[in-house]
A protein has these predicted regions:
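Short, basic (Lys/Arg/His-rich) helix/loop patches that form interaction surfaces
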Residues: 42, 85-125
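Short, polar N-cap/turn motifs at the start of nucleic acid-interacting alpha helices
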Residues: 23-25, 80, 97-99, 118-139, ...
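Short alpha-helical segment immediately N-terminal to, or the first helix within
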Residues: 4-5, 18, 112-116, 126, ...
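Short pre-functional
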Residues: 1-11, 29-30, 111-112, 154
Length: 179
């Protein structure tokens, strides 16, 4: 579940809605029913594909449901979107990490793509956004990544700010004669 969320950027409801018939193993594609009932075919990368195979062969209980991800007890009930979120939170807790929501994995994929040089339209295509505005939300400013690109303010020394730097900056005369 985590790999499907993190590598494909699916929403938790899309993961919950995956059925066995949605996976075309021959073509390496996944059919996803997205927001608004839109049906889209996505490539299935090797890593999440192998994780799904491992779940289907070693983890998923025998059951009649066609849902890919099911409960263990009671056996074979389709997981809800809320249960997908719970799986993410529980995995974080077991790993000793701060709890995050399933949607944070979608954000992380977008951030990783942008850091690797993908354009906003490319990220939007992977996330299946209809609007560029939706994708722009994922392009939050990354201070750490931007710091090496920014030129220092004239007269400032590299490194951490001095404790009284703010006070000194207030004493500087304003351009245009104001002080």
């Amino acid at each position: 579940i985590l790999l499907v969320l993190a590598r494909l950027g699916l929403r938790r409801g899309e993961v919950a809605g995956l059925c066995l018939d949605d996976i075309d193993w021959r073509s390496g594609e996944l059919t996803v029913v997205g927001k608004g009932g839109r049906v889209e075919r996505l490539p299935l990368p090797v890593e999440p594909g192998e994780a799904i195979v491992a779940w289907l062969t070693d983890g998923r209980p025998e059951c009649d449901t066609r849902s890919v991800f099911t409960t263990l007890r009671p056996a074979g009930q389709p997981l809800s979107a809320g249960a997908i979120g719970h799986v993410v939170g529980s995995a974080c807790q077991r790993a000793g990490l701060a709890r995050i929501g399933a949607h944070q994995l979608r954000h992380s994929l977008a951030t990783a793509m942008l850091r690797a040089g993908a354009s906003l339209p490319e990220v939007g295509q992977v996330l299946r956004h209809r609007s560029a505005r939706s994708t722009a939300i994922y392009a939050k400013v990354d201070e750490v990544a931007l710091r090496p690109l920014a030129r220092p303010w004239p007269g400032t020394a590299p490194g951490p700010a001095l404790p009284d730097a703010a006070a000194r900056s207030l004493a500087l005369p304003w351009p245009g004669g104001r002080s």
